[in-house]
Amino acid sequence: MGLCSSSSARRDAGTPGGGNGAGNKDNAGRKGIVACGKRTDFGYDKDFEARYALGKLLGHGQFGYTFAAVDRRSSERVAVKRIDKNKMVLPVAVEDVKREVKILKALQGHENVVHFYNAFEDDNYVYIVMELCEGGELLDRILAKKDSRYSEKDAAVVVRQMLKVAAECHLHGLVHRDMKPENFLFKSTKEDSSLKATDFGLSDFIRPGKHFRDIVGSAYYVAPEVLKRKSGPESDVWSIGVITYILLCGRRPFWDKTEDGIFKEVLKNKPDFRRKPWPNITPCAKDFVQKLLVKDPRARLTAAQALSHEWVREGGQASDIPLDISVLHNMRQFVKYSRFKQFALRALASTLNAEELSDLRDQFNAIDVDKNGTISLEELKQALAKDVPWRLKGPRVLEIVEAIDSNTDGLVDFEEFVAATLHVHQLVEHDTEKWKSLSQAAFDKFDVDGDGYITSDELRMQTGLKGSIDPLLEEADIDRDGKISLDEFRRLLKTASMSSRNVQTPRSVHRS
């Protein structure tokens, strides 16, 4: 059951592929008119017929067909997506093709993304040449399993590969937007074949701090925030959560006879973890799925965080955990916080134990290339350079290090890193009682006399700051009584996670 309609409705998010971005520049003519149909010149190579021989038909879509083909020079077998120029009657159809090629190029080389070779064109068609995957769709393998479900071990292998794709997309400023079993192919028919993401037709580049306002995707896998017209990278993780639920129990977590009924289920109801086989599935697996299917996208695990979860770790180890885009965003955001908010976050970070910080430990280790227990300016530069939409200059990176580096030694240790990258909203949503306990403990570090308030004198004593403290208190002092209550302190901490995860994204549901 799909939500896909014409692609003309989806460009209202201000993304690079949309009205204001790079996706339009290449398409615009001298007067801003995009040539369509046979008039379209994509600038791709024109020698497809000389390079490849088309073979059997593999499948077809709205605008074209996919064929097996052979490279005339190397005899290598490939897949070719042939798109009819005559069907590109609107400029957005031209943009869609250019964007898909751009995305395939951006993700080139990732082990779980179908390999892109080249794009060609002639007067009638565009040809996108890709890796040939002959193992069939993930959906077909699910249906072939007994009771249409995987063992936990096999499911974890599949889910890990999907999460790696999502994390890589998000680092490149991309959201897939149509994660579903049909869009993952196995390289071969072998049982242990690698999984490859394909069909980036609904994917798009995102601008940090923005959200998509259109409804796209496939009904069973669409995230609540997509239906609310305010979606971003987190929607991919929700879709993977739905797929994981299906892999483990053979049923969809949200189902109804109608599309609108499915949407109501997604928005209002929680998945059922009581029916068989869930009582026989490990608590660790259930915890994993539940944290991917959190309705609030701010509290949902990111793709990189999910890869650090105990259930999905390869052999119990966090092997090749990619950088988490939200961790990099949080570090940039930390610079903008008031001194009091920074101190409050450091106090909160100090209350967490090693198990609660396992995902951030993985991220710290990924950035700490020389494994000396601290992050240098150069290591942080290298990490932030991988955040494609941002790629900060040297002075900006130094500014981040100086803000995070509380002991002013020019390095970032793990405790400093945690304070700057903590997902406060996840703490609030995942375990309310634990949040209350941790925030109380952080508050108590400032409330020296234990009277239930933080005064300017106590703040000065705990921070060592000189000069007037009153301006620092004003941000949190909602009732203007000159001191900070526990509720006001908690409110201040919660605002730390409000802006750092607000990032934006593209479409097989399609509603304008």
From Swiss-Prot:
Interacts with MPK5. It is a lipid-anchor. It comes from the Eukaryota. ATP binds at L58, G59, H60, G61, Q62, F63, G64, Y65, T66, K81. GO terms for biological process: defense response to fungus; intracellular signal transduction; protein autophosphorylation. It comes from Oryza sativa subsp. japonica (Rice). PANTHER family: SERINE/THREONINE-PROTEIN KINASE. Gene3D superfamilies: EF-hand, Phosphorylase Kinase, domain 1, Transferase(Phosphotransferase) domain 1. Ca(2+) 1 binds at D368, D370, N372, T374, E379. Residues 318-348 are annotated as: Autoinhibitory domain. Activated by calcium. Autophosphorylation may play an important role in the regulation of the kinase activity. Ca(2+) 4 binds at D477, D479, D481, K483, E488. May play a role in signal transduction pathways that involve calcium as a second messenger. Functions upstream of MPK5 in a signaling pathway that represses defense gene expression and negatively regulates resistance to rice blast fungus. May be involved in arbuscular mycorrhizal presymbiotic phase signaling. Phosphorylates the elicitor-responsive protein ERG1 in vitro. Phosphorylation is calcium-dependent. A lipid is attached at G2 (N-myristoyl glycine). There are 3 contiguous domains conserved in the CDPK subfamily: a kinase domain, an autoinhibitory (junction) domain and a calmodulin-like domain. The autoinhibitory domain (318-348) inactivates kinase activity under calcium-free conditions. One of its GO terms (molecular function) is calcium/calmodulin-dependent protein kinase activity. This is Calcium-dependent protein kinase 18. Residues 1-25 are annotated as: Disordered. Induction: By the mycorrhizal fungus G.intraradices colonization in roots. Its main location: membrane.
